[in-house]
UniProtKB/Swiss-Prot annotation:
Domain BTB residue range list: 92-161
Name of the molecule in the record: Kelch-like protein 13
BP-aspect Gene Ontology terms: cell division; protein ubiquitination; regulation of cytokinesis
Gene assigned in the entry: KLHL13
Known function: Substrate-specific adapter of a BCR (BTB-CUL3-RBX1) E3 ubiquitin-protein ligase complex required for mitotic progression and cytokinesis. The BCR(KLHL9-KLHL13) E3 ubiquitin ligase complex mediates the ubiquitination of AURKB and controls the dynamic behavior of AURKB on mitotic chromosomes and thereby coordinates faithful mitotic progression and completion of cytokinesis.
Subunit field text: Component of the BCR(KLHL9-KLHL13) E3 ubiquitin ligase complex, at least composed of CUL3, KLHL9, KLHL13 and RBX1. Interacts with AURKB.
Residues in Kelch repeats: 341-389, 390-441, 442-488, 490-535, 537-587, 588-636
InterPro entries: BACK, BTB-kelch_protein, BTB/POZ_dom, Kelch-typ_b-propeller, Kelch_1, SKP1/BTB/POZ_sf
Keywords: Cell cycle, Cell division, Kelch repeat, Mitosis, Repeat, Ubl conjugation pathway
Length: 655
């Protein structure tokens, strides 16, 4: 069927071969030739005021200096000469005939062989056609053969929808790769809602991988609009299954996708054989119970096909156990988003020391912060961790208090699929200035402080039971420490014990419920951050005592090798940051906000460390200065609205 195209103008493609502007028979008069030597010993040949594209360079040898000249127009002259010989029927040594007519095309064997591996093998590989004067090319049409021959002799190709398929078929059969590339560009440039299905069919027929990928991308991006056209029902099973399984599919609810798939299945009876395979790509657990009962269970094959029945049972079980969902994740429960972002949460604002409840993500493409659903209550000095792309916020403080007397025990969980929060079981003890890690599907809250003082205790949260239980405590109480996980165990570094900054490193193994001492850091530090990249555990920033009542930023950084049990220094930070958020994004370390003791103020800076280059860079700023902020990475739906940046405030005195 003919394609509907968004332009009726033919595309003229030219191979990058220079065209000589003068007649081949016109001699170059010495009076008009000038050699211009440049400092780099390259030369240009000029004819009057027009450059002729000649160049030269010097080459030294034992025989003396040799000047080598190059003409950039020679290939064009030769090509024009061969084309003229073809048009005049001179020196042609073979005649090609298309498979659908008796038309004859006299050509030169050497030209065809130089442009096509197919013809090269035919004329030099001992095939019977090698000695034939007339060759019939079955499978190549008259239109296609003419286009191929014209291109070989002129380096130009004129394409429109009337000749595209013939040209594509001939180029594929005869292995004329530049023509195939032109056809790919032509197809991609003209894809619309009306012809995307047919373009995809052509791409599959001729194995045009780039075109097929583009059609997939186009259909994904425009799927909601495609659903309102008749073209949707013409999609082949493979492409529809790909679209339904993709995390890049946006702006469609799972119920809309289910209804559309049912329409596609019911168009033709044989399609019902694909019902179970397609339904595996619908994310039934993300539907509401009402949608499942009113719209899904009423469809006959969803009640009779065993696979479909199991899909409904899976959805029902998932929805009945909301606390367990982070450890029940599968392809059918994942968010339909293909973008992971740096996310920040809470913190205390420099202005009036107000605690924030904002949850934000940084849009790397738009270079701006965007707001997600805020917490019900503000938080700083809290712990955050991610299990199954669910964000947990644990403990911390709702009011500004440097002594931890207003610590809380509440725990909330953010679901990016719905941009909503829910409360889960509270800690056994209120705690702030502590560390939280996610390890093997559990949460571990380590140390900290509250109104009763410093804490050595460690609690473990089990999403399967929605309970916190105590595990082995630390040998000494710690607060302001940092932690990370590697190799199935948790590492805790530094912090403050009995008002003394530490440099120790401890390792907790959840399988044995024991703490093990490791090689200490080279520098004491607290309120720092820690993260894992590859097989290295990085310790960054923080502060320590300068005297009895004052503090200094710690700019030095180092990493720990669990395999060698040793520390190695790395490049120092550009600016001091304590009590920060830290996240690893695309193998780079982002240190977010915090407090600078040297400058006596909260900071809005975000610094990035590249482990491969051992370099620090300031990359962007927070919307406002925030201390006690936390950060992570999360796969989310980027919202449309941006976060406004408030005016800068003057630094406050140190807390």
């Amino acid at each position: 069927m003919p394609l509907k195209w968004k332009t009726s103008s033919p595309a003229i493609w030219k191979f990058p071969v220079p065209v000589l502007k003068t007649s081949r028979s016109t001699p170059l008069s010495p009076a008009y030739i000038s050699l211009v030597e440049e400092e780099d010993q390259h030369m240009k040949l000029s004819l009057g005021s027009s450059e002729m594209g000649l160049s030269s360079h010097l080459q030294s040898s034992k025989a003396g200096t040799t000047r080598i000249f190059t003409s950039n127009t020679h290939s064009s002259v030769v090509l024009q000469g061969f084309d003229q010989l073809r048009l005049e029927g001179l020196l042609c040594d073979v005649t090609l005939m298309p498979g659908d007519t008796d038309d004859a095309f006299p050509v030169h064997r050497v030209m065809m062989a130089s442009a096509s591996d197919y013809f090269k093998a035919m004329f030099t590989g001992g095939m019977k056609e090698q000695d034939l004067m007339c060759i019939k090319l079955h499978g190549v049409s008259k239109v296609g053969l003419r286009k191929i021959i014209d291109f070989i002799y002129t380096a130009k190709l004129s394409l429109n929808m009337d000749n595209l398929q013939d040209t594509l078929e001939a180029a594929s059969f005869l292995q004329i790769l530049p023509v195939l590339d032109f056809c790919k560009v032509f197809l991609i440039s003209g894809v619309t809602l009306d012809n995307c299905v047919e373009v995809g069919r052509i791409a599959n027929t001729y194995n045009l991988t780039e075109v097929d990928k583009y059609v997939n991308s186009f259909v994904l991006k425009n799927f909601p609009a495609l659903l309102s056209t008749g073209e949707f029902l013409k999609l082949p099973f493979e492409r529809l299954a790909f679209v339904l399984s993709s995390n890049s599919l946006k702006h469609c609810t799972e119920l809309e996708l289910f209804k559309a798939t049912c329409r596609w299945l019911r168009l033709e009876e044989p399609r019902m054989d694909f019902a179970a395979k397609l339904m595996k790509n619908i994310r039934f657990p993300l539907m509401t119970p009402q949608e499942l009962i009113n719209y899904v269970q009423t469809v006959d094959f969803m009640r009779t096909d065993n696979t479909c029945v199991n899909l409904l049972l899976e959805a029902s079980n998932y929805q009945m156990m909301p606390y367990m969902q982070p450890v029940m994740q599968s392809d059918r429960t994942a968010i339909r988003s293909d973008t992971t972002h740096l996310v920040t949460l809470g913190g205390v604002l420099r202005q009036q020391l107000v605690v924030s409840k904002e949850l934000r993500m940084y849009d790397e493409k738009a270079h701006e912060w965007k707001s997600l659903a805020p917490m019900d209550a503000p938080r700083y000095q809290h712990g955050i961790a991610v299990i199954g792309n669910f964000l947990y916020v644990v403990g911390g403080q709702s009011n500004y208090d440097t002594k931890g007397k207003t610590a809380v025990d509440t725990v909330f969980r953010f679901d990016p699929r719905y941009n909503k929060w829910m409360q889960v079981a509270s800690l056994n003890e209120k705690r702030t200035f502590f560390h939280l890690s996610a390890l093997k599907g559990y949460l571990y809250a380590v140390g900290g402080r509250n109104a009763a003082g410093e804490l050595p205790t460690v609690e473990c949260y089990n999403p399967r039971t929605n309970e916190w239980t105590y595990v082995a405590k630390m040998s000494e109480p710690h607060y302001g420490h940092a932690g990370t996980v590697y190799g199935g165990v948790m590492y805790i570094s530094g912090g403050i014990t009995h008002d003394t900054f530490q440099k120790e490193l401890m390792c907790f193994d959840p399988d044995t419920d024991k703490w093990i001492q490791k090689a200490p850091m080279t520098t004491v530090r607290g309120l720092h951050c820690m993260c894992t990249v590859g097989e290295r555990l990085y310790v960054i920033g923080g502060n320590h005592f300068r005297g009895t009542s004052d503090y200094d930023d710690v700019l030095s950084c180092e990493y720990y090798s669990p395999i060698l049990d040793q520390w190695t220094p790395i490049a120092a930070m550009l600016r001091g940051q304590s009590d920060v958020g830290v996240a690893v994004f695309e193998n780079k370390i982002y240190v977010v906000g915090g407090y600078s003791w040297n400058n006596r103020c909260m900071v809005e800076i975000v610094q990035k460390y590249d482990p491969d280059k051992d370099e620090w860079h300031k990359v962007f700023d927070l919307p406002e200065s925030l201390g006690g902020i936390r950060a992570c990475t999360l796969t989310v739906f980027p919202p449309e609205e941006t976060t406004p940046s408030p005016s800068r405030e003057s630094p406050l005195s140190a807390p």
